[in-house]
Amino acid sequence: MTQNMLTVSALYHFTRFDDPDALRAPMLSLCEHEGIKGTILLAKEGINGTVAGPKQGIARLWAHIAALPGCSDFEHKESTASVMPFKRMKVRLKKEIVTMGQPNVDPRAGTGHYVDPLEWNALISAPDVAVIDTRNDYEVGIGTFEGAIDPKTKTFREFPQWWAENKHRFHNKKIAMFCTGGI
């Protein structure tokens, strides 16, 4: 990697922040000091964001986030860029970090089983598995897994309604869902 390469990193982590507003200013200050740009969303349910900056600065930001309550095990994905992909740094307060419009859903209370890529290939090959692509219409248009069901949503916020209207179709199936952030 050349010296001028930037680290681009994305994360989301569900946890419980009693006062996300108190986390905002210190995080923004750290990012600005380290030359990091992008967007971080903070909510009572956790943190979500994509940022870019010098590798050492990103490492300092991740250390800061890992020190927050409930975040010691957060995961992130990294890539590189030769040009800064973002114009400014924003740390925003939101009601949800992944917009679903479902205030009574607590993602920490129950999630699906995450599988690694080798398990995924075996899983979606099974005849009793329905594969659902939860990404938006633009992302699905770029490509999807063969046989995946496209809910034809413009945003993830539309997915809960689609599921409520269609879950009866899957009563005898295992469900494998995927999105841009992971499988």
Regions found by a protein language model. Give the residues of each.
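Cytosolic catalytic domains that perform sulfur/thiol-centered chemistry
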Residues: 1-183
